[in-house]
Amino acid sequence: MTLIKPFRALRPAPGRAAEVLAPPYDVLSSAEARDRAKGKPWSFLHVSKAEIDLEPTIDSHDAAVYAKARDNFHRMIAEGVLVRDDTPCYYVYRLTWQGRVETGFAAIASIAAYA
């Protein structure tokens, strides 16, 4: 049985990564994210911290926040900001944060062994 397989990821279109780039959702408050995303309509913060596009009084766990994240994500795809790779791939990535480097691997994984 195959345990991992490649997949066709959604990634920023060529030349658009700088527009999409955003810090992890859990390192900024909603106010900081709102400020950082100001004037950056394609920042991924509009997905990962979608409350920044709603009234500041809304709870960040409100269903409206998740609906806004979905809508923003779909808009990024529809506008060609995020595009799906043509062929299935395995992905290696590296994150650097505050002097710490983490390297990861992304693939489709079977959960059958855990069922």
Give residue spans per PLM region.
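A cross-family signal for N-terminal binding/gating loops and helix N-caps
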Residues: 1-114
